[in-house]
A protein has these predicted regions:
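A short helix-loop-beta-strand connector motif used in the catalytic cores of GNAT acetyltransferases and
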Residues: 30-40, 49, 54-58, 77
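A short, internal acetyl-CoA/4′-phosphopantetheine-binding micro-motif in the GNAT/acyltransferase core
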Residues: 79-89, 117-118
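Conserved active-site alpha-helix within GNAT-family acetyltransferase domains
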Residues: 118-137
């Protein structure tokens, strides 16, 4: 629904640079079409968090996705996850990842993701390490750097 897309787009843009910026709602629609697993977190019927994940084999052109595509036969890639600033540190991130872990475990999939290291996203690095992710690589781009993680 357009309302949901608008809300997800806005939440994504409010979470940059921790989450990659989207060019447009059309860009968001394309990501959702490519995705295999999504989850919305609601509070009083308002979207306060979301996650968008892709499986191996989709036609996603992200360099970060390609890092895992070149190394793994199968995986669940967390393309983006965002929580509204006013709803952080309330357990929503843990709840989203518990759902993702259950989904991935059902299909025996490793979960792959990256976290920005330049500019540094220390809260996300700390969170993913607490959730059991292990660093498996890093990459420097012209305007940012990332660390790659698997669980």
């Amino acid at each position: 629904c357009e309302f949901e897309l608008d809300a997800i787009f806005k939440l994504n843009q409010l979470n940059t640079p921790e989450v990659g910026a989207l060019e447009s709602i059309e860009h968001l629609k394309k990501l959702i079409e490519l995705s295999s697993y999504n989850l919305l977190m609601l509070h009083n019927e308002e979207i306060v968090g979301f996650i968008i994940c892709m499986r191996e084999g989709c036609m996603y052109e992200s360099e970060n996705y390609k890092f895992f595509k070149q190394r793994l036969k199968k995986f669940l890639y967390v393309d983006r996850v965002a929580i509204d600033l006013n709803h952080r540190r309330l357990g929503l991130g843990v709840a989203i990842y518990k759902d993702i872990f259950a989904h991935a475990n059902n299909e025996n999939l490793p979960i792959a993701l990256e976290v920005n290291t330049q500019p540094i996203n220390q809260p996300s690095l700390n969170f993913h390490e607490r959730m059991g992710f292990e660093k498996v690589g890093s990459r420097h781009f012209d305007d940012h750097s990332v660390a790659y993680f698997l669980k």
